[in-house]
Amino acid sequence: MLLFKFNFTTAFLFTILAFAQARSHSSSSSSTSKSSASHHSSINSTSATSVYDFSSLTTPIVPTNGVAQEPTLYESSRGLSCPGYQARNISEYSYGVLAILELAGDACYAYGTDYPYLLLNVSYDTEERVHISISDLNQTQFQLSNRRDVWDAPLFYRSSNFSGNLQYNFSFNTDPFEFWITRIADDQVLFDTRGNPLIFEDQYIELTTNMVEDYNVYGLSGSQQSFRLGNNLTKTFWATGYSDSPEANMYGSHPFYMEQRYIPIGTTNTYTSASHGVLMLSSNGMEVLLRSTYIKYRMIGGIIDLFVYSGSTVSPKYTIQQYVQSIGTPTMQPYWSLGFQMSRWGYKTLSDLINMRSYLNASNIPTEGFWNDIDYMSEFRTFTVNSTAFPPNQTLDFFRSLDESHQHYVPVLDPAIYAANPNKSADRTYYPYYSGFEDNIFIKNPNGSAYVGMAWPGFVVYPDFTNPAVLQYWKQGILNLSTAFGSNYSYDLPFSGLCLDMNEPTSFCIGSCGSDLLKLNPVHPPFSLPGDVDNKVYSYPEDFNATNTTEYKSVSRASQSQYKATATSEKSHETPSSESLINGKPEFSINYPPYALDTDTETHDLAQFGVSPNATMHGNTLRYNLFNTYGYSESKISFEALNSIQPNIRPFLLSRSTFVGSGRYAAHWLGDNKSQWSDMVSSISSILTFNLLGIPMVGADVCGYNGNTDEELCARWMALGAFLPFYRNHNSLGSIPQEPFRWASVAEASRSAIEIRYSLLPYWYTLMHTASVDGTPMVRPLFFEFPKQISLASVDKQFMIGTALLISPALEPNTTYIQGIIPGDNDTIWYDWYNHSVINHDYDENITMSAPLGYVNIAVRGGNIIPLQQPGYTTYESRNNPYSLLIAMDNNGFASGSLYIDDGISMQTNSSLSVKLNSNSNTITCVVSGTMVSSPSLANITILGLSNPPNTILFNGQQLSDYQYSDQTLSLTNLLDLTVDGAFSKNWTVTWS
């Protein structure tokens, strides 16, 4: 939730939220179903006395802009005179290299004080991974690798199966010290610092690697971004609750990239390919400069903790497996999380949820989960429930009804804890604040007092998730939230998961702004909020049909008038001076380091939209050194707390802020996107990227979060979302309602897409299990499956689900056709999902595909066997329905596939099934291993690409009579009686002649 670009120089802003209710929207969209609009118009109506109202609160004068900084990125001269280092006292071993690095000349004081001596420690961790650590000799710089209590991963431990058969060479020169890493298999240089002096200062570290021409790099993400990164781009890693620019720093930090290289074979216009990976492990602020001939790392603290993965000359998926296995494979999510989820900021009462559920059910739109934003809280305070808007008895009845229908409820949980007003008697019962002080678990100021920022409740304090005592505190908070909802069962939570929002963490002011102002609490944040009279939403998607509707005219006039009012009151920022110098050296500064990061905030102050760098964490660790890990730490603690409360139920967590390895604990959504076609397009790139980064369960707010969607965009996005891992419709308070039943065409598109998604649940779940075992992405770019086809390197508007399905969505308004590529050479066979016909295509050529509204082009790749189930209204119903198999033969008449089955919810599965399926020109074999009893039978088998009709078909030796053959498609039906004990209760074989 949050955030628009706030201009704090004006008293209040107008662009956060709040334009329409369903009734007003129904009059503005000519294509809206009248019956739908009138039937559902009451869903957002609430009693004025039952919901929290900001309007009477005081707006305190607090610092919001900070001190204006000029990003250092745009300076070019600093560091050019730095001498680099020389290697001394070198010791080479079978497992690595140790050396002392000595400054090779006078200190240059680029953006800090140079260390005269460094320690080089090169460790050959595995056959595929080398770790280069460069630290100051006295070990005074912060090292994340020394804080295993905060962040731990397999990459810190040498593999017990290490054979010593290295797939790489580490080479170096001594004067100046420079190193390069080469993959032995093809002699490709993977990382190369030659010709680039190392700079290592107390607040500035610079390391540069040379790059090949027109390199293909992917990763380096914080949230939304393009897929293939350009070579004139800077990525800033500084977790913040706000960003308004593509590629800018945002919620998280993942300083890992994968490079895919194409090596031409003679003059034949064909290529081999190879990939490798690079991780610069750091929780400090960082910029990565991608330029035409190099990639440059600039860090404002810590050390160099560089991991290079030799990757693969076969497929990039092996490179990603190496990386993800080293940081920790993603957690296995519960089966229900693959269902469609419905959410918004604006379900203010229990009645809103009940009505919304009823309308979805009446519209026959399968819905798995129902989510609340902060509306359910009492005065937006964490671990509380507004008992007027959500009466405990009725709320528990609602939860029981969900449970009986095998549906789920997920509330949002913000980390910021309301700072109780000492003069308000009602605040004295707010346990999360007082018990947190008793447990001493809040982030502190340098003087030891509590750091008091600002969030939705007013002035707030922040739990320190690195404090060992915070686990019990957080666990108790979750239990108390359960009780506040009316539950009498401490260890049987009424909610199925938690949505971890605002966990960078976000603050609406600079510094500990509320330390001396708690007697004013609760206070109004220093900008206009949902429900304020001047807070309307006027934006619509690109190419929105601006007809003569009253809505659009009034929106346009109001938007222009408010823009003019804001523009005239805009004030220029204070002109910053250069950093302070002491004896010619940059002054050490935590809040305003000499190297100013290019953050996407108004002043580039590091504390804007976050907790200040000089705040203190457990063990007197500066937040400056752990800045990018807060969301990771909250996910870890929340996972452990839920696991402690319900030990055998998989925790489901959805986190906005993520760091390296967050996938071990949480899924991720891309944050506060916009209801724009461009945001729908970029969501594909971001989801593909996070699958490379070890967080496969990821999705965007379908139909958009900020701004108003429209019918066409929402129909297209609901259809697209069904083919991405995490599928949730969510938008902001003040924007028009966008539940899929609001428009007839959106409802139809949703039903069609969800029907396909739910039929594919066995396939999706198997992909999820594979990801949790070895890190293989669930959704993949095309070049992952076709790594030698160079034209696919930049394709990011089509994608693969696993190895078998190619998804080609419509991503532009006012179109019924799309252009797309069908990958692979002319021997690669693709079948149309809907009619099973062979798709004709030429190598490396786009084809035109029909794409009417509500339709997504799906191609099935020959060589795959896809397990399916008859879709139901919920994932529970679906997984208890009969199975079927879709077998798509390749050019040689072969196909294979797999299926993983467990109970879908247990943390430790006592029994499961692994099924291997293979087919050739006249036989299908099913080999089952495992002890789980799975009762659904097998209903039918469809075989595509069978050249000749069969005369006789046998299922485990028993002749079949129910089959049809047409256009190279064989359909075997009425198999239920042959598999009454379960489709995969035992091995079986189908043969034909």
From Swiss-Prot:
Record-linked Gene3D superfamilies: Glycosidases, glycosyl hydrolase (family 31), Golgi alpha-mannosidase II
GO BP terms: oligosaccharide catabolic process; polysaccharide catabolic process
Sorted UniProt keywords: Glycoprotein, Glycosidase, Hydrolase, Signal
Organism listed in the record: Schizosaccharomyces pombe (strain 972 / ATCC 24843)
Active site (record annotation): 504, 672 (proton donor)
InterPro entries for this protein: Gal_mutarotase_sf_dom (IPR011013), Glyco_hydro_31_C (IPR048395), Glyco_hydro_31_CS (IPR030459), Glyco_hydro_31_TIM (IPR000322), Glyco_hydro_b (IPR013780), Glycoside_hydrolase_SF (IPR017853)
Entry GO CC: cell surface; extracellular region
Class in the EC hierarchy, top level: hydrolase
SUPFAM superfamilies recorded: (Trans)glycosidases, Galactose mutarotase-like, Glycosyl hydrolase domain
Xref: Pfam families: Glyco_hydro_31_2nd, Glyco_hydro_31_3rd
Protein's recorded name: Uncharacterized family 31 glucosidase C30D11.01c
Keyword Glycoprotein belongs to the record: yes
Molecular functions (GO terms): alpha-glucosidase activity; carbohydrate binding; hydrolase activity, hydrolyzing O-glycosyl compounds
Family: Belongs to the glycosyl hydrolase 31 family.
Glycosylation sites: 7, 44, 89, 121, 138, 161, 169, 232, 361, 386, 393, 423, 447, 480, 488, 545, 548, 614, 673, 814, 826, 835, 846, 910, 940, 987
Signal peptide (from-to): 1-24
Domain of life: Eukaryota
EC number: 3.2.1.-
Organism classification: Eukaryota, Fungi, Dikarya, Ascomycota, Taphrinomycotina
